[in-house]
Amino acid sequence: FMDTIYIIILTILVLFVCIFIYLLCSSEVKYQTTLKRNCLMAKIVSKYTYKHIDRYKIDLSWWKDKPVEKISINSFDGLKLQGYFLKANTNNFAVVVHGYGAKAMEMQQYVKLFYEKNYNILTFDNRGHGNSQGKTITMGYYDYKDVQTWIDFLIKKYPQCKIVVFGLSMGGATVCMYSGTKKPKNVKAIISDCAYSSSYDVINNIANKSIILSIIQTMKAYNIYLKYRIGFKL
């Protein structure tokens, strides 16, 4: 009799876990909460974005006639990161950091702005994005260290460079995190555009819109998973 009870309890627990995973992996919430780079829902935009899709189209034709040099570095934890460099005849440099789910080339309008002001341009695919390695998007937690590495790369190659660091959305949060570090004197300015102050609050707000996810306290479970698999918590 007790064996039957144990089997029933175990079955219920397994079912509960399966439902939890399904909700994270199949619902609209997944797009907002996933940190996996190849997730199916990461390719799906929100209903609002889809409704106004013309506003979000990105024309990449500006890059076609530009002498872009592809460069790469190794991150502190051994990932190969892909960067793109546009040279100008000046000591002014702009490091441009993209946001969640984007790629370096999609920062075209910001790159264009700096380039037309005669800045050398370094933009790159964040870890877990584009042509850079990494299975996980770290919401700035490790990315700001990558910014440090890219800047060290520039300074080593161009000792007299004067650097402006610009970040958008998750990139904005990343450069904010970088701003709290001990920076080389070459870094003259940091610009953060529409950053979040807390990735935990952003994801928690989305999760709480689902009754089931709010009941099972998604963020507590999610942070346990992140700490175990990736080494940090939101």
Q: Can you say where each PLM-predicted feature lies in the sequence?
A:
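Hydrolase active-site cap/lid region
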Residues: 177-234
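Alpha/beta-hydrolase active-site loop
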Residues: 137-158
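Alpha/beta-hydrolase fold nucleophile elbow
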Residues: 158-169
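Glycine-rich nucleophile elbow surrounding the catalytic serine of serine-hydrolase chemistry
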Residues: 167-177
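An N-terminal hydrophobic leader/cap segment in hydrolases
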Residues: 12-74
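Short beta-strand element of the alpha/beta-hydrolase
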Residues: 91-99
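A short loop-to-beta-strand scaffold at the N-terminal edge of the catalytic core in hydrolase folds
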Residues: 76-86
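Conserved alpha/beta-hydrolase
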Residues: 111-133
